[in-house]
């Protein structure tokens, strides 16, 4: 195993780099007790409403472009070892095809596109209080107060039993149906908070629990990431605008198991670049799924995603990964969404997510930043991103998509 990776994987800060939370990784490492279930009243305690109902700060267009400012704003949990690892992935690992990036014409065209009016960049809105959970809904242990245990890259990968697989089929089908419902709500003028509330009720009506709600303090039932926001966007009162694209990530907990899926939806008519971005990302997902089979190396997934990204002159994000899933929301393995040389082997009965995020950028590896809500991750350049995700079962003859 890569020595640098071994060093960083044992640090608690690894949760802030690789995907141990939903949508590809980065999250707050502390779990707020205010997010746990109030057993007496059978509701989730709301965050301090006064604290939450204020404008969240975002600054893609402020003066953090200077090297000095950038250095000062490096995430507190992003250690030098982590940055060294990312550099090693970018510079020293063999890749699916040469990472020459864009040619001069492509780079000039992309640079012109990225330096657009900063007023078009996404600003955080007001986040409403957490929704209530009825007493009869079964909650995951982390909502009841049990700490989340972060997994490590060399942890054993679960081989699911026939009974477990059947549970995963049921919750996977539910997640698929809820995501489809969420997609029907997307239109100009609706807020992501309104979408969250409607989806939340749809999940509750099925007797399921929205896995993100209360996970390490996340305040909502789904993730909604608009335009240049890569992942973990918190639903708020910003209305969707004509021409936006929005990533909706849905995870359900039902009968003790989690099912996870995500898709990118257009808001009204979108431009050709956005259509191309969505098309490329969905192709990357299915190209990667095609590599899944008993005995295959996990690194084939990342290499295939990177091949598609290179073909479309789009960027990948090494820090965001897929993950194992089952009775736990996130578990081994790490499923890297970029070219890598890790040699873990897929085996029949394993279940994990594949969830590429492709980004418009002038570099093969997109730079990102985190908002002060400690969840929302956006492109530093302002390039838009798309994401698609499925939960996959390794079968004797290949794979089964549990969320399709």
From Swiss-Prot:
A divalent metal cation 2 binds at residues 260, 323, 355, 389. It is found in: Mitochondrion. Binds 2 divalent metal cations per subunit. Has a high-affinity and a low affinity metal-binding site. The true nature of the physiological cofactor is under debate. The enzyme is active with cobalt, zinc, manganese or divalent iron ions. Most likely, methionine aminopeptidases function as mononuclear Fe(2+)-metalloproteases under physiological conditions, and the catalytically relevant metal-binding site has been assigned to the histidine-containing high-affinity site. One of its GO terms (cellular component) is mitochondrion. GO terms for biological process: proteolysis. Disulfide bonds: none annotated. Gene3D superfamilies: Creatinase/methionine aminopeptidase superfamily (3.90.230.10). Its EC number is 3.4.11.18. PANTHER family: METHIONINE AMINOPEPTIDASE (PTHR43330), METHIONINE AMINOPEPTIDASE 1D, MITOCHONDRIAL (PTHR43330:SF26). Removes the N-terminal methionine from nascent proteins. The N-terminal methionine is often cleaved when the second residue in the primary sequence is small and uncharged (Met-Ala-, Cys, Gly, Pro, Ser, Thr, or Val). This is Methionine aminopeptidase 1D, mitochondrial. The gene is metap1d.
